[in-house]
Regions:
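C-terminal regulatory/interaction module of P-loop NTP-utilizing enzymes
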Residues: 1-191
């Protein structure tokens, strides 16, 4: 809802105080998390997929590509195909449950049902696009759960963070979860 009531002078695309947004519309926005912003609320992290640019980008050359139009129905069909084709394994879900219990016990942060639902939708699509199940889980864990750690007093949680790295290694292997390892190690270095 844009405005609470209708007016004859409203722009033509506003009907009854509302703008109709097509289903295939994706919102891209920015949220600065710098010295002027203390933290971004959990609600925002929970409801969005975040892309963090932690490294400097470098220009590169590539051939010009023409536009490709894909109707939303086709995109949704491709997404829907991935669920049964690449479901998150029960073993991984069980391990993620253990990780959740560990994070609750050590940091008093819970993942919540919304994040589990997103994980079960996102990871099959991630795998369908050529990624691996564990890299998809790493992305969700780092960007949905570990980002919440920024609001904690890390100086008092260094031992717990080291234990978290050990737990990740125990559950998934020391060669997995590179994003999470980098994030945790950066927190340890900076505090």
């Amino acid at each position: 809802e844009v405005i609470g009531s209708q007016d004859a002078r409203d722009p033509k695309l506003i009907e009854g105080g509302r703008i109709k947004i097509p289903i295939a519309t994706v919102f891209f926005g920015t949220a600065n998390n710098d010295d002027s912003t203390f933290t971004i609320s959990d609600k925002v992290y929970d409801r969005a997929i975040w892309l963090f640019f932690d490294d400097k980008g470098y220009p590169f050359e590539c051939p010009q590509q023409g536009p490709m139009q894909i109707p939303w129905s086709q995109m949704q069909a491709l997404f829907d195909e991935c669920g049964p084709k690449y479901p998150v394994s029960q073993t991984t879900i069980d391990k993620f449950g253990e990780l959740d219990a560990f994070v609750i016990k050590k940091f008093r942060l819970a993942f919540g049902n919304r994040i589990m639902k997103q994980l079960k939708k996102f990871v099959p699509i991630y795998v369908g696009c050529g990624g691996t199940e564990l890299d998809g889980i790493d992305f969700i864990f780092t960007n949905k759960i570990l980002k919440k750690f920024e609001s904690l007093n890390i100086g008092f949680l260094k031992n717990e963070l080291k234990e978290l790295i050990q737990m990740l290694d125990k559950l998934f292997g020391s060669d997995q979860f590179p994003m999470a390892h980098n994030f945790i190690n950066n927190m340890l270095r900076m505090n």
